[in-house]
UniProtKB/Swiss-Prot annotation:
One of its GO terms (molecular function) is sucrose synthase activity. It catalyses: an NDP-alpha-D-glucose + D-fructose = a ribonucleoside 5'-diphosphate + sucrose + H(+). This is Sucrose synthase. It comes from Solanum tuberosum (Potato). It holds the Pfam family SUS_EPBD.
Amino acid sequence: MAERVLTRVHSLRERVDATLAAHRNEILLFLSRIESHGKGILKPHELLAEFDAIRQDDKNKLNEHAFEELLKSTQEAIVLPPWVALAIRLRPGVWEYIRVNVNALVVEELSVPEYLQFKEELVDGASNGNFVLELDFEPFTASFPKPTLTKSIGNGVEFLNRHLSAKMFHDKESMTPLLEFLRAHHYKGKTMMLNDRIQNSNTLQNVLRKAEEYLIMLPPETPYFEFEHKFQEIGLEKGWGDTAERVLEMVCMLLDLLEAPDSCTLEKFLGRIPMVFNVVILSPHGYFAQENVLGYPDTGGQVVYILDQVPALEREMLKRIKEQGLDIIPRILIVTRLLPDAVGTTCGQRIEKVYGAEHSHILRVPFRTEKGIVRKWISRFEVWPYMETFIEDVAKEISAELQAKPDLIIGNYSEGNLAASLLAHKLGVTQCTIAHALEKTKYPDSDIYWKKFDEKYHFSSQFTADLIAMNHTDFIITSTFQEIAGSKDTVGQYESHMAFTMPGLYRVVHGINVFDPKFNIVSPGADINLYFSYSETEKRLTAFHPEIDELLYSDVENDEHLCVLKDRTKPILFTMARLDRVKNLTGLVEWYAKNPRLRGLVNLVVVGGDRRKESKDLEEQAEMKKMYELIETHNLNGQFRWISSQMNRVRNGELYRYIADTKGAFVQPAFYEAFGLTVVEAMTCGLPTFATNHGGPAEIIVHGKSGFHIDPYHGEQAADLLADFFEKCKKDPSHWETISMGGLKRIEEKYTWQIYSESLLTLAAVYGFWKHVSKLDRLEIRRYLEMFYALKYRKMAEAVPLAAE
């Protein structure tokens, strides 16, 4: 048997050099094609199109050195003749940079700062030799443990538990942080877990053994109060459990950890420690209310997410508190902006109880300036000058409401996460970040060309706020892997913040590490009271059917519905979203309009935008104009129905099921979707679903089994895929049932609020513990962020114009 020889892995530069040496003419021909584009940025599809355009013989020669594979890994090419620089993504979170001189055929490796400096020449012309502010967060996390495998990305808590269980409990001294952690637990002056009788780890172990011996003799259902005083005398307080059985489980788990620690036991033990009683959730922008707001500008999936999240979270908190043997009432406050002029909604009401919850409320605090309260709605892109004063007011309001500090602060979206960072910093509380969507990935090249976008979107403030929040927070929740680190071919939202530049402002050489164990994938679900299968006939809300029939099929055209459906026998192709550029509803209408086969098979119904009132949102105005033009140009009346945004979520659930009755399908055609809550809703109702392959839906749907992926950048192909599906269903009705059932099964396995709530509270416990035992106040990075906030962000925010009243 031949001896196996280990060979050195060649660097990227060496591989390109080898290709150059072997095939100079072919590589020169290709690079000349790239250079001919002139100064600018080429995207992956443009690079591959140029490669496809060269002769097959030349391609074959270059592929001897896997040149096409290298190109497929290239996320952008910067062309500044005679130089072409490539940003090559070897795998998620791992990048290298090179540049090639087309004239001299010389290859250079570039560091991140060198690549970004080269890229800045697109904007600045000659390289700016003056001092440029470089942001580098890597030194602050260099000593923290991190996984290195791609499969570990988004499983931060698992990695952290393995690390903690390996590092701790190996001798008496290593147990001290745990002892201090258990002794630190109290609520409004009441001691929990351990009292002053236990001063060291030896005493703790002895007490636990005594407790174990005593508990074994008791009937499992014995309530805690029957042995409460006995336990107090030996040093144990409330919080271990409500019955002898549960207390014994906790005691045995801790003894097992002290004897032979393992990550699963550690996570289970930490998840049962009483830690979270008061939660503050920040979501300032948009119209945040429970009725009559969905479809308003900046008001969509995030509002639904939080209103579904909170009742489920409260239920899990109540369950855990009961099982811990405590009589504490938890509180959840959703903090948003008070809008005095939002007529017809509760957005002007200071406090509002959350439906489906007993101890959760929406707390509204107004934006203020020196002139007083800001009364009107403000776009999410223009909130930045108000945030600092808003948080000062919020801190006072939540203190008055809770009469205590929150135990966990959860931010949502950019400004909510900045607010959470400021509040957590002020109060010294564990912080959780939920981005929902990071705008930098939605708008290509919005970093390098930020000045073009800033007047309208103020991305300089927003991207800076995102950087501050993601580096300040204790842990980050995402709905999908793609949100963090993309896929084999696409860059993740957080990954896009690893390195970028905004010329004239600053250069980010290390913004975030996607391998950081603060990242955790915790996917939401749909409210099971509103969204359930069309086949559950006994639960169906048939009282809504006359209204839904009117909405879909009436011959009346008005502000609520435009155009009519002439053939009621055809299935309905359905979509529902905000009417903005990224959601791409007009794109779907155009695909449909230009595909005669699809038009012959199905009717198209679009729910989005509000034609009942004049929109203040510029994007919505532009999309409305485009929609009217498509209807007129393609003569869609008769096959198409445009319905204004529907705000009744209960009826919307039945609307999905009503569409399913027609053997229709749901389409989510967005250019990018961070998660895709409507995708989950539609699948939960048994409606076959087609959704964008850019973002979260690519993970929610298993293509061909529980739905279908579509590429919004190739609308013709997407329309053909839809037509193929409906043609197949026409010939074989069981195909529709197969995809419907596949979607329902997928949801049941992965996307429920119960799974979500259990995970979130366990994360809060583990990261709270990690923060304590590692003395992880992260003072150094927080000081760095304070300076960045005060010297850079604040000036940007102040430059955003205040809204006219």
